[in-house]
Amino acid sequence: SASTQRQALNAIVFLYKNVLDIHLEDKITPARSKRTASPPTVMTPSEVQRLFAAMEGKPALMAKLIYGSGMRLMECIRLRVQDIDFGQNLIFIRGGKGGKDRTTILPQNLRDEMFRQIEAVKSLHHNDLEEGFGDVYIPEALARKYPKASRSTGWQWVFPAKLRSVDPR
């Protein structure tokens, strides 16, 4: 493959230049193989519909949200209640790929389902608080400035885990 050939060539160039102290750049110009750019594999709309039809519950909502908004999987998993803006149909993605923040759309056809999911999260959070739980991880600086923020509804995960766990910190 192209990457294997490039790695071997770079190893030889390193050997000659840094170990043997022979500079080959002036004497030879090796032919470098190019990577072949393959087009991405994309599902047809009918395949997507069949996939969604085979799913149900929270995984189906997550898949539809990822597909409809262009989010990455971990961005969806890390989504918090306060990151959903129903007024402007926006989703705020914090700390996405490359640590960057960005904004994407909340698909119109998922508004009601997302609203029900957030209402379920609020109810679950209320029950957790009554039982002495309900804290979520928040950035340390924020936790110092607002000690009770980790218990607020806005910081709760939109798609919480099924099992309750306690943050060891």
Regions found by a protein language model. Give the residues of each.
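Conserved catalytic core of the tyrosine transesterase superfamily
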Residues: 1-169
